[in-house]
């Protein structure tokens, strides 16, 4: 909560979103909301206990669900559930979609990135997920209302749903030309593309006494060299291909 409050106090910061597994939200949600948190993304890949243990290697599904329930008490904080379809039988994607059916919560299905541990899963195509959902809930209609965020997610409405269904399909529906994402790792490295090591070391600049203006120039230089797009489908490993896992990168 203290970090959220500090970030919100910075001039120019318009919105702060927290992505989490939700296990501590039952205790911390009130403080996070009071600190000014605008939006919350909670990772939930299955409602099956054994499946959750298999995916996360931690038996904390009940804590995540309690966190989601607690977050729903704060309507001023936009709530989204992120699900990464892995193509394993323990996942019932329709059960996850029920959150958007029963509550004013947006459920987003995020295509597996073939990075680190993710390269061992086949995942599921957006088309297959749409087919599964439409068989149970009816037609998904492209959402054309006010933006629900500033990212690449494509949202759909379903008759009778309180929330929206979204898809972030970076591989099968490549959106690199519209990408507005950069990531700062826990080691202080600014990454401009998930597939490549391209970026700048901000930690080193800070430790060497870099000024705000110098940091701005470093960031501008990194952005000017942002790759035009990923080449995951080509399955060709270049010298600058990222070897870190998503948990190490931050995302």
Stretches with model-predicted labels:
Residues 101-102, 112-115, 119-251:
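Auxiliary Fe-S-binding modules of radical SAM enzymes
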Residues 1-110:
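Radical SAM/AdoMet-radical enzyme domain recognition
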């Amino acid at each position: 909560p203290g970090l959220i409050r500090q970030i919100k106090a910075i001039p120019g910061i318009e919105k702060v979103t927290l992505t989490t597994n939700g296990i501590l939200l039952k205790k911390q949600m009130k403080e996070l909301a009071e600190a000014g948190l605008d939006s919350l993304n909670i990772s939930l890949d299955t409602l099956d206990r054994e499946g959750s243990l298999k995916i996360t290697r931690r038996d904390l599904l009940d804590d995540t669900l309690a966190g989601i329930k607690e977050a729903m008490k704060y309507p001023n904080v936009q709530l989204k559930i992120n699900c990464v379809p892995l193509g394993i039988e323990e996942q019932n994607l329709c059960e996850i979609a029920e959150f958007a059916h029963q509550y004013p919560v947006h459920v987003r299905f995020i295509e597996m990135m073939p990075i680190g541990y993710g390269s061992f899963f086949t995942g599921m195509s957006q088309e297959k997920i749409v087919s599964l959902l439409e068989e149970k809930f009816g037609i998904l209609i492209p959402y054309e209302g006010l933006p629900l965020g500033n990212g690449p997610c494509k949202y759909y409405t379903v008759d009778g749903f309180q929330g929206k269904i979204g898809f972030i399909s970076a591989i099968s529906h490549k959106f690199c030309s519209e990408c507005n994402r950069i990531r700062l790792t826990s080691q202080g490295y600014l990454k401009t593309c998930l597939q490549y090591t391209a970026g700048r070391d901000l930690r080193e600049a800070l430790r060497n006494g870099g000024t705000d203006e110098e940091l701005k120039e470093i960031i501008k230089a990194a952005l000017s060299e942002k790759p035009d797009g990923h080449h995951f489908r080509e399955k060709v490993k270049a010298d600058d291909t990222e070897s870190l896992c998503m948990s190490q990168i931050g995302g």
